[in-house]
A protein has these predicted regions:
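Bacterial Sec-dependent N-terminal signal peptides
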Residues: 1-22
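Beta-lactamase-like hydrolase cores
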Residues: 18-58, 77, 121-133
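Conserved serine DD-peptidase/penicillin-binding transpeptidase domain
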Residues: 26-27, 76-357
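Short glycine-rich loop/turn motifs
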Residues: 36-39, 307, 319, 433-436
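Small-residue-rich helix-loop
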Residues: 50-52, 313, 323-473
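Short active-site loop at a secondary-structure junction
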Residues: 52-68, 72, 76, 80
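A short glycine/serine-rich beta->alpha loop
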Residues: 54-59, 246, 368-369
Length: 473
């Protein structure tokens, strides 16, 4: 027995020495010479630290913020939670069609391989059975669940207007995203605009795009929510008959209503007006409507599927909606700030689980805000809780991409001993590279967070340095 104990302790000592050497090499890597580095690796079986470096330092996290958002959503709402969007007739005005938004980010989404237009086809078929072809009808889209501050005030101008920074509202459609197509075959700048998909009839583009010969996509669309003026800058590849970049739909609720109107008109139903609740909301006007007969109900996929999309594909749009629905469940007043209520609940919930949030500064649910900050120790504690205490442990673990296999980790740790054995979320914005998740290899069961800010090397050099460190564990 004593010999076995001695052997076990000796092996542990060897493992720790390897980890410490791996940490030393990471910190001395030339790509990180001027960087801020925070690391925490915790043994999930014992709760003890395997290796750490400045674990309490608050650093910019980028998309590993989604670990917090997705974990909190699962704990509050459950893995089977579903958004429900209803189309009803208005009892107080029989000529008014109501679309009642629930904050579902998946309406018309192509993420899950569904027919993106099925929502409109099914509603049209259902309404044709209820409406009279000789009467005129209006559409009122109730999209005010989260209010109309759809983006974080801490997002940067370079992001606003692009698809990955789309607004979050009570109604979404087509991932709140459109494609803008160009013809660059003439190799003359600015390239000719061909079309948008879906057809964004109202948007006016000011085109400052130039062309490159590298084949890289550096095109960006700038513009604020609810404005139809968009500026296009940057550069895109020359010599293409068609090339597209993506932007955010300025007013998703109105676009959904107008698209539904087009479907109804083509089916023989007369539509005289399309409105959203925005004007009435901003005027604090109490609109009298009474949902009557439910004509169509659309139920989203369960939360477990949505969370997996958030973490595997790093879907900002879904993550932002999750944080706001968290907030709205805590404060049902539609004039309260759903984003701030969500942030407040995140802090409250994790404090209740005995995890200090003193290092946490949160401005969104996706990690796009560069002012977000928290410590590696904080996030690793959440990971440990989700693995050892949460009833959603398996759902959460399965939502994280596998190293060398899928999602944002497809090329990370590929062809190494830990391929498929690390399940983690990556995070990267300018000068930031982070990884947070689990290493499960037999009896070796670790939660880890690696956060690197303001590195001077290339991103590939930093990723390689992190891979070498993880291989030392």
């Amino acid at each position: 027995m004593k010999q076995f104990l001695f052997l076990y302790l000796s092996l542990c000592s060897v493992c720790l020495s390897y980890s410490q050497e791996g940490l030393r090499q990471l910190l001395n890597d030339s790509a990180l010479k001027h960087a801020s580095v925070g690391i925490q690796v915790t043994d999930l079986n014992t709760g003890k630290t395997i290796v750490s470096h400045d674990p309490q330092k608050s650093l910019t996290p980028a998309s590993i913020t989604k670990v917090i958002t997705s974990a909190t959503a699962l704990e509050l709402l459950g893995s089977e939670y579903r958004y429900v969007t209803q189309v009803t007739l208005d009892e107080s005005d029989p000529t008014r069609i109501l679309v009642l938004g629930s904050g579902d980010p998946t309406l018309g989404s192509d993420v899950f391989g569904d027919n993106t237009t099925a929502f409109f086809i099914n509603i049209t078929d259902a309404l044709k059975k209820e409406l009279q072809p000789d009467r005129e009808y209006s559409i009122y889209v109730v999209d005010n669940l989260f209010g109309y501050d759809g983006i974080s005030p801490e997002w940067t101008w370079i992001d606003i207007g692009n698809y990955y920074a789309s607004g979050s509202y009570g109604i979404s459609i087509f991932d709140n995203t459109y494609k803008l197509f160009f013809n660059t075959s003439a190799k003359i700048a600015p390239p000719r605009i061909l079309r948008t998909e879906p057809d964004m009839k109202k948007i006016r583009f000011t085109n400052f795009l130039t062309l490159n010969t590298t084949g890289s996509d550096n095109g960006y669309i700038y513009g604020i929510p609810f404005s139809y003026e968009r500026t296009v800058k940057g550069n895109i590849p020359a010599g293409k008959a068609e090339f597209s970049i993506k932007g955010d739909i300025p007013d998703p609720g109105l676009f959904l209503g107008e698209t539904l109107a087009d479907y109804l008109v083509r089916s023989g139903i007369k539509i005289s007006q399309v409105e959203t609740a925005r004007t009435d909301y901003l005027a604090k006007k109490q609109v009298q409507y009474k949902p009557g007969k439910i004509v169509h109900t659309l139920t989203s996929r369960p939360m477990k599927d949505i969370v997996q999309e958030v973490n595997v594909k790093s879907n900002n749009h879904y993550a932002e909606h999750l944080l706001r629905i968290i907030g709205r469940t805590q404060n049902t007043d539609i004039y309260s700030d759903a984003l701030q209520a969500g942030i407040d609940y995140v802090k409250k919930f994790w404090e209740q689980q005995g995890i200090s949030t003193s290092s946490l500064t949160l401005h969104d649910g996706s990690g796009l805000a560069p002012q977000n900050a928290f410590s590696p120790a904080f996030l690793t504690e959440i990971l440990a809780y989700m693995y050892t205490k949460s009833k959603n442990s398996k759902v959460f673990f399965d939502s994280l991409p596998k190293a060398g296999k899928d999602g944002t980790l497809r090329s990370f740790m590929r062809n190494t001993k830990y391929e498929g054995k690390i399940s983690a979320k990556s995070g990267s914005i300018g000068g930031v590279q982070c990884y947070s998740g689990y290493l499960i290899d037999g009896n070796k069961q670790y939660a880890f967070t690696v956060m690197i800010n303001k590195f001077n090397g290339t991103r590939s050099q930093v990723r390689s340095a992190i891979e070498k460190f993880l291989l030392s564990l």
